[in-house]
Design a protein with these regions (language model features):
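Structural alpha/beta surface segment adjacent to cysteine/selenocysteine redox centers
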Residues: 1-67
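C-terminal cap of thioredoxin/glutaredoxin-like
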Residues: 47-52, 57-161
Length: 161
């Protein structure tokens, strides 16, 4: 399956030898980094050293690689801090945001918003003033058809999608 997607790297240990109990610690860690980005402690600009990713995006990418390619347990904070150190993220600031509850509060807010908007999968697209939801493994043409229908339909007419 992965052979059809050259950007996907799947190692032999993914979901066999290493089975994290939860991905919540990774999300908590990423939320701390996102807060640092919002506060301009770290750059939010794309970086050519990371293939055009921001630091936040690069950390998320490397967490996925650590699990899927390298078979590491991304539920362990030590693994996450090692990855963050590799890209020179301010690990002390990340730890402080996790310790003081700010990252947890932001993560819980995201969970509440997910419930409010009835998010059932990833990715999820909420369209048409909240009346339409697309989620999961959808092809580009389905998403494009729905967006085009909304953009080009005459006023006061129901959408076909």
């Amino acid at each position: 399956m992965c052979a059809d997607f050259p950007h996907v790297e799947l190692g032999p240990d993914a979901w066999t030898k290493t089975i994290p109990k939860s991905s919540a610690s990774s999300h908590h860690f990423l939320k701390a980094i996102q807060l640092l980005e919002q506060k301009s402690v770290i750059s939010s600009q794309p970086d050519i050293h990371f293939g055009g990713n921001t630091l936040f995006e690069e950390m998320a990418r490397r967490i996925r690689l650590a699990f899927f390619r390298d078979g590491l347990n991304i539920a362990e904070e030590s693994v996450l801090f090692d990855i963050a150190g590799q890209i020179d993220l301010p690990v002390q600031s990340i730890a402080e945001h996790m310790r003081n509850g700010e990252a947890m509060a932001a993560m819980c807010r995201d969970i509440e918003l997910g419930k409010q908007y009835n998010i059932e999968g990833s990715p999820t697209y909420i369209l048409n003033e909240g009346r339409q939801k697309l989620y999961g493994n959808l092809g580009y043409k389905i998403i494009e058809a729905n967006v085009n229908e909304i953009l080009h339909r005459p006023e006061n007419q129901a959408s076909w999608c």
